């Protein structure tokens, strides 16, 4: 899955920068240090947008790798794939993980805005940008 990230600075005449980021597979992936995230403007606001209907972006704790596992597990409890087999969803043609992934994306969101200084996202010490691939 490839995510398109757009980053815009403080100048409204700027067209912005776009870059692609490849998700390694299902799960919550810390992408703060990915070259595409670093394609942000020198200052202003970076808007990261995921052009995919079963993936989301969020900011969360970046120190303990268990956070990624726990986030994935919690999302699977909140929106279980078993709903596919229980008749909860009408949209079922693309497999048991498809509609659950769409719901997770809707709950978390497909874009995020982050202030930028010196070309780096301004986040707290323990914050990182996550790409969540839900299927």
Residue ranges of model-derived segments:
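Active-site histidine-anchored catalytic micro-motif
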Residues: 1-135
């Amino acid at each position: 899955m490839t995510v398109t990230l757009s980053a815009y600075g403080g100048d409204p005449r700027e067209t912005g920068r776009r870059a692609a980021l490849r998700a390694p597979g299902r799960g919550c992936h810390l992408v703060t240090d990915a070259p595409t995230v670093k394609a942000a403007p020198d200052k202003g606001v970076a808007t990261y947008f995921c052009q995919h209907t079963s993936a989301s972006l969020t900011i969360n704790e970046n120190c303990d790798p268990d956070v990624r596992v726990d986030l994935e597990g919690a999302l699977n409890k909140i929106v279980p794939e078993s709903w596919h087999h229980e008749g909860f969803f009408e949209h079922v043609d693309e497999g048991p993980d498809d509609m659950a992934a769409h719901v997770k994306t809707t709950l978390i969101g497909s874009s995020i805005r982050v202030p930028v200084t010196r070309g780096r996202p301004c986040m707290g010490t323990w914050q990182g940008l996550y790409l969540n691939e839900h299927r």
